[in-house]
């Protein structure tokens, strides 16, 4: 798991994951950070109250089979999904091409990928209490 001070943590034999139908599979060698994102964009693209994002350096991510299909979700980011089953898989910001965020639910064994902080906390829905005790960081983006 990633550390809050920005250091990456290697995963030993790697973490594996993919989409619901198995068409898109990936392997992660090291995780940079994990956080809950409460921003409007993540809430809308997940169809849920918030997203849990696992950030990895691009060189630590390999696609084992088909790659995701991408679409622009905003002027600053694009999202990857499986074109066969529609599973949302990734998020990449134009300003940070060296890293990719993967959805925690796409990992085969996500239990060790606990969030370290909340992002976009001012946009958090009032009834969401999961991770409320974690540190909070803000975003200026509104969608």
Predicted regions and their residues:
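A short Gly-Trp-Pro
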Residues: 1-143
